[in-house]
Amino acid sequence: VNSRSVPVGNRRPLLGAVAELVNATNAFTPLTRHGYPAIGVFAFGWPTSENAPLVIAGSALGALRRALRGEYRSTSGRISLLLKVVSWVLLAVVHRRAVTSRPYFEDPLSEVLGPQFPPIPPRPGGVWATGRTRRRFVEKTVRYGPYRSNVADIWVRTDLPKDAKAPVLLQVPGGAWMIGMNRPQAYPLMSQLADHGWICVSIGYRISPKHAWPAHIVDVKRALAWVKANIGAYGGDPDAVYITGGSAGGHLSSLAALTPNDPAYQPGFEDADTSVAGAVPIYGRYDWITEGFPERRQFGSVLERLIVKLPFTDNRQLYLDASPITHVGPEAPPFFVLHGTHDTLIPVEEAREFVEKLRAVSQAPVIYAEIPYAQHAFDVFGSARGHYTASAVERFLDWARATRPE
C-alpha cells in the first residue's frame, strides 16, 4: 500500500492493526530477550499473554465498530482486517498454550510427591475467569519494623479460630529491589490459601536506590522474626512458616530460606528465629556474580549503580553472600522453584542452574516446574497460569506441612 495515496484518517485502522499484530507476535514469542528493550517486551507481552481472550474481545469489538462505519471497504481497510485476524489467531494459540499448561505444573509435583496426592483441579470459570483476583481476607495491616515500609497485610479468614495453629505463608513482593509494591502481587495464591485455612503475610520492605543492599533482606528477616513472635495471636503456627516471592521476591525468599538465623542479616535481632519450613521462589534471581551471558553483565551494572552501590571488583564477597546459589547446602528446606521459558527479565537458565546446584547437595526435595511459553510474572493475574500456580503451590505446601518433622 502506498502510504502517500491513503489519507491519514484512513491509515489509522491499518496502523492500529499493525500495532496489534506486533503485540500479538510479541506475546506469541518475545521479540527480544536482550538489553533494555527486553523490559518493553515484558511490559506488553506479559498482560497480553495472560489475558489473551480479553485482548481478542477488545480488538473484535473495535473491528465491528469500524466495519459498521464501512472502514474495511478500501484496500487498506481489508489489509488491516486481515492483520487483525492474524493477530486473533496468534492470541488464540497463546491462550491455548496457557490453558493446556497444567501438566507442567502438576507432573514435577507428582514425580516427587507421588501419585497419591490429588491432581491440580481444572481451571474454574472458563476464559472469563481471567483477571479475577480478590482481596477478601485482609483483616488488618500491621507494622513489623521501625521503617516506613515495614508493613504487612495479614490475610486470614474471619472465622479462623485463634487457636487454629494454621500454617503461615510469608509473601515477599518483587519489583527489581526498587519497587516496593506488595499489592496486588500473589493475590490468586494468597486468596486461595486463606480460603483453605492458611494465614498469609504479604510484606513491604525497604527498596533501592534510597536504601542500599542488604536493607532488603534484613527487612525480610525482620518480618520473619515478627511472624514467629506474633502470628500465634492470629491463629497461626509459628513453627509452620513458609516463604514465597516472585522476581526480586524470589531472590529474597530463597536467600532467606537458605540463610536461617544468619546474624549478618539480623542486626539488632541476632537471636531471633528466622528459619522457614519450605520455600517457593518464582521466576527469581539466584546469582549476583556469574557473568555467563550478556544479560547478566547488564544486570551487574544495575546492581552496582542502583542497588548495592558498591563496585563488584572491590566487594566480591558482598555479591557472593547476596546470591542464593552461594548458600545451597544439605540443610536447605524443601524447595519448589517455578520459572517460565519466555521470561525476558530473568532468563530461565537462572532457575535451571540454581535447581541443579541445590539438588546436588540438599537432603530435602527440590521440585522444579519449568512452564513453556510463560513470561515473567505469569502468576499475578487470575489467569489460567495464575490458577495453576496457586493450586500447585498449595499442593506443595500441604505436602511440606504434612511431612514436616515434629
Predicted stretch roles:
Residues 2-406:
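Alpha/beta-hydrolase superfamily serine-hydrolase fold, recognizing
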